[in-house]
Regions:
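Donor-nucleotide binding loops and adjacent catalytic segments primarily
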Residues: 1-82
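C-terminal amphipathic helix plus adjacent low-complexity
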Residues: 134-183
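Short, surface-exposed connector motifs at secondary-structure boundaries
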Residues: 16-18, 96-101, 152
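A donor-sugar binding/catalytic signature common to diverse glycosyltransferases
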Residues: 68-117
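Short hydrophobic alpha-helical runs that function as membrane-insertion/retention elements
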Residues: 47-49, 103-104, 125-127
């Protein structure tokens, strides 16, 4: 989307920036959570927030923070220096495909699995949900300054780009279907 690209490039000056998104996760007391987060976000450090279902927003405008609405993660994540998210399978996959390091803050279900996998693969870290607003600043600094994590994220994206996930999924479904017909 050309309009998204224009808005982000004007805001970022062409630099990669941290991106915060919680996808379909919603929170109780979102305003209070965001206030805790903004109180600890490093002064002068730019950030892109995708509002998502959580309705992440600012109580007042901040020149260093851009809040955007619905947009494809595949479009958005290429502008990221680090992706801060909940660890949903789709968001994790999009960040892996984009070749960007991740900070995962899992909330429930398989999000803990994806956080462990990203950490095991060396392309990101996990922060515990309870204190994430207070810990996010140092975590972003750590991940952005980790040459190893950046390189591993790029390496994983290169591997994923050689795979044809759709074709493989169709093949597996066809095999499963034909096995069920033979029963």
């Amino acid at each position: 989307d050309a309009s998204l690209e224009k808005v982000i490039n004007e805001f970022s000056g062409g630099e990669k920036l941290p991106i915060l998104t919680f996808g379909s996760v919603s929170f109780d007391k979102t305003e209070k959570l965001m206030q805790r987060f903004l109180n600890k976000w490093p002064e002068g450090k730019k950030l892109i927030i995708q509002a998502g279902w959580a309705g992440l927003s600012l109580l007042e405008e901040s020149p260093g923070i851009l809040v955007i609405g619905k947009v494809s993660h595949d479009q958005l994540f290429r502008y990221g220096s680090v992706i801060i998210h909940h660890g949903g399978a789709g968001t994790t996959a999009s960040a892996l495909h984009a070749g960007v390091s991740q900070i995962i803050i899992p909330h429930f279900g398989d999000q803990f699995l994806w956080a462990r996998e990203v950490r095991r693969l060396g392309s990101g870290i996990r922060i515990r949900r309870r204190k994430w607003p207070e810990r996010i600043g140092p975590a972003v600094s750590f991940v952005e300054n980790s040459f190893q994590m950046k390189e591993k994220a790029k390496e994983l994206a290169a591997i994923l780009s050689t795979e044809d996930g759709r074709r493989n999924a169709v093949r597996e479904l066809e095999l499963l279907h034909s096995a069920n017909i033979k029963r």
